[in-house]
Structure formats: structure tokens, C-alpha cells
């Protein structure tokens, strides 16, 4: 939340675009992460990563049962192929329920609270919101702090919900943020629409890996499909303008 608030301060006080400052601050966070992992009390010997987080903090669904002999026998006996694929081949965890709850929380705040109304007003037009007496700078900082908190929650889910349950030294950014932008565009920035678009995005990405492994087809095909979907969604406004223009002729 504090990292997102810093982006908000840069936007509100100095007019620095949040995407630009966010990318730059992400690199600062990446190198700070690498610095911290290099500390002797945090770095696991003979590795470039931290120690694993405590197993009690893992949020993998049925983790102990599916790794037991009885669980593996039940999942791999061929009578439950879908459950076997999902539970054995993926790191399905309770983070999916947290994400859905977060989407509903964001929807409620934006559509059922005064603060949410002010945030939407500032996002739609900061000058009009300022003229209406809304504190634009405060709402910019609060909205980006809230976004940063959600990003922090996602990071915690990645560590506690997926192998290897530790923080590694990074040489580049994983790109989750840009995936998030793509998902938001596919949902037309609707908090509840994000649930469906995220599942579609994840399904396409997972399907791309399966296509590459099973058929030998290039996974770039899925990236082309995703890019095409996002392109036409982003162009929807232009299509409406074109339709209005042609309708007036």
C-alpha cells in the first residue's frame, strides 16, 4: 500500500504519470528485493533465494492430502481425471477465493460508498471533480494506495500459494503487472468483469502451454489471440465513434 501511495504522491503533487513512475519504482523494489535476499540471515545457503516460508502459512488447497500416498492414489487412479489434473499439475490455492472477494470489495467501494464515487469522478475527469469540490489529490493517493495493497496481497498469494514458497533473486520483472492491465482492459475496467476476464486469460495462457507441449504448436498463437481480444476491446470506443459518425451521414 505504501509503495502504491508513493506513486499516488508523485502523480498528485508532480503530475508524473502513474504507469511511468510505477515501472521505475518496480525496478527499485526489484533491486531492493535482491539486496535483502543477499543478507546472510535471509538467504538460504547454496541458493539464490530466501528460506521457504513456514508450511503453516501455505494456502495450497488440500496440500497435505494430495501429497500423501492415499491422496495421490485417489487422484491418479484414472477415475477423477479433471481433479487429478487440477490438483496435481497446478498450484491451485485459496488465493482464487481471496481474489474474488477482493473484486467484490472493490466493486462495493466504487459503487456503494461516497469515497468510491469520488474516486470514479476523479478518474473520469479530474478538472470536473475539482470544480465539484472533490479533493482530487487525496483521492488519487488513496486509490493508488489501495491498488498497491491489492498488488501486495497478490504477491503474498504467489509466495504462500505456489511452489517453491520462497522469494528468489530476480533479474527481470515477472510481468504480472502488465498481465493485470490486460485483464482489466478485457473486463472494460469492471471490478466484477475482472473475475471472468482473469479466468479467461489464465485459461488461454494455460491452454497455450498445453498446446505447445501436446501438439508442438508455438505458444505465441495464444499470445496473438490474447492480443487480438485486447485490441478489439480497446478499439471499442473508436468503433462507437465511427458508428455514430456513419449514422449521422
Where are these regions (language model features)?
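Helix-capping/transition residues at the boundaries of transmembrane alpha-helices
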Residues: 11-13, 110, 186-187
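Transmembrane alpha-helical segments in multi-pass inner-membrane proteins
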Residues: 145-151, 157-227
